[in-house]
Structure formats: structure tokens, C-alpha cells
Amino acid sequence: MKILICGAKDSGKTTIAKPLAKQLGAEYIRCGKLYTIKDFVAEGKTVIIDKRCENNRKIEKLDPDYVIWMDTTEQRIDTPPKVHQHIKKRFDSVDQQVSAIVKKYRRSCS
């Protein structure tokens, strides 16, 4: 399973990605090295990919199963073609935000 957390610079991708990977028992990969991602997925692991994606070609190349779009800055990027969770504002509590993401993610997988 490949979970992509994408957004503009300083949108909070890493702030969410690291604790999310820990809560899901997933591997955290910053910037999406394709060979590493393929290896982890082949082993049956869930991978959290933390990547700045200014355009949809980058997203399509990663071929994620689940997309979290961090749309929290004034910088505009292409809207991802398929978004499972759209985060529109900064969060007061990272733990609460990650818990909400995990809950919605698990609901979508069942």
C-alpha cells in the first residue's frame, strides 16, 4: 500500500507523515525514491511517501493507492486527480490530526 502525502513547500507534509507512519507501522520515505518504494511494497509493507508534488505527472509516476493532499498554504499546485483526504488548514494538534487521518484511512480500507 502506497500512501502519498503531497502538497506545496511548508504545507505540513513531514509534520503529518512521520507520526502517521509510526501509528500505521509503515515505512516513511521522504521524496519518494521509486526503487525503495517498490522494494517495500513487494515485501507487503505500507509506505508513507512525503513528496512535494507541484504537478500531477509526479503523482501519477508514484501511482499511490491513497492520497492525502496538504492544501494549507497560499502556494498553488495542481489539484491531485484523486484525493482521499484534503487537509485545508493548519492543525492545532498534530496528534489529533493524525488520529483523524488514521480513522478515515482505516474506514476506507475496510
Labelled PLM ranges:
Residues 42, 46-83:
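ATP-dependent NMP and nucleoside kinases share a basic, alpha-helical "lid"
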Residues 5:
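Hydrophobic anchor at the beta1->P-loop junction of P-loop NTPases
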Residues 23, 61-62, 108:
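Alpha-helix C-cap/termination motif
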Residues 12, 57, 96:
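Residues that form or flank phosphate/diphosphate-binding pockets in enzymes
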Residues 8-46:
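Conserved substrate/cofactor phosphate-moiety recognition/catalytic segment
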